[in-house]
Amino acid sequence: MQSLLLLATLLGSALGGAIPSQSANYNGYKVMRVSGDDTSKISHIVSKLGLETWKFPKAANANVDIVVPPKKVAEFEKMSHAAGLKKQVMHENLGDSIKSEMSFRPYSCELLTLDGGANDTWFQSYHKYEDHLKFMQDFQSAHSQNSEIVTSGKSHEGRDITGVHVWGSGEKGSKPAVVFHGTVHAREWITTMTVEYILAQLFDDKEAGAALLEKFDFYIFPIANPDGFVFTTESDRMWRKNREQNEGGCYGTDLNRNWPYKWEGDGSTTDPCSETYRGPSPGFAPETKASTSFIKGLADGAGVKMFVDWHSYSQLFMTPYGYSCSARAPNDDVLQEMASSFADAVKAVHGTSFTTGPICNTIYQANGNSVDWIVDEIKGETAFAAELRDTGMYGFVLPPEQIIPSGEETWAGVKAMFSKLK
């Protein structure tokens, strides 16, 4: 167990916050998937070589995805062979994979169909931040009678945290709120596109979308961490946190460890250079302040019916809690049924398998997270954390060809989940 906790501490520690402005170069970097029956051997290699991990195991023989710089490949191969670890190459050259993924398609309003829907062309590529803003603005203009651009507040660098509020008949804001957050962790680009796909389907899927909009107001935020996302497109594709400068020269707070509920604990760290740095105080980050204030306003109005925090990767759909592996939400039975219906519907589309269960038991302990805050602090009726594609050989650098399949299966899961909501 101690070795698993060490791996959790080491998650991303090597590159977690020490890159202020220069572009990160991943040419020649390998991403290796390793496993073994003694996780202490893996944690020893990670610690000794100062390696970054993309994910760590819940148990022995589970996979650990490790980023290996070119200068350390030979030593990594030697040590992992001596330790008897199983290995697979995820990315032979991470730099090449990133270049391929960054073939951004220029934005044009022609990416909207004549009736205001989202042309599939938009979902065939990842996009720059400015183009996401244009897409949201043009999409809202095409549905001006039933939508508006909203902002929850400002990021550390002064960017608006922009979303789209959509509704059906009746007055805006008169129905219980559904809030979706994407790109809380900056490098998780598939979440940006998938959340936008859901937004599009609320209008493009005429029957199902209209039925949902008659019951709920949707608040869709594809990029909840705009500074971090911009940094991934301009400087370091693997950046996770926001862009605040911390003491000691490191940058960034993990925005999903900074929510003001159960903030302290083993599911985050006080190390400002770590990728799971929880910040100097609960709710300190400007992005967290903005999100909590905005959602409190919804709770004080018609209430919050559902919240989903979309992440990648690992193909998980999780329920509260993250701060504890023994605590359960008051309506845990309902949440588990909804999560299972999501997973079943997703699998029926492209065969993609999702695992369900409480956050702490399913992926890792995570205190100061948004889902726990939603359920216990503002009494939101349902809240989930999702980890989208993949479990294969791509991880965070998912090819753009998988955007549409991810959107299709996720929308199917969302519809199924709502069918279980009383």
From Swiss-Prot:
Pfam families: Peptidase_M14 (PF00246), Propep_M14 (PF02244). Residues 17-119 form a propeptide. The active site is at residue 387. Belongs to the peptidase M14 family. This is Metallocarboxypeptidase A-like protein TRV_02598. One of its GO terms (molecular function) is metallocarboxypeptidase activity. GO terms for biological process: proteolysis. Extracellular metalloprotease that contributes to pathogenicity. Gene3D superfamilies: Metallocarboxypeptidase-like (3.30.70.340), Zn peptidases (3.40.630.10). Keywords: Carboxypeptidase, Disulfide bond, Hydrolase, Metal-binding, Metalloprotease, Protease, Secreted, Signal, Virulence, Zinc, Zymogen.
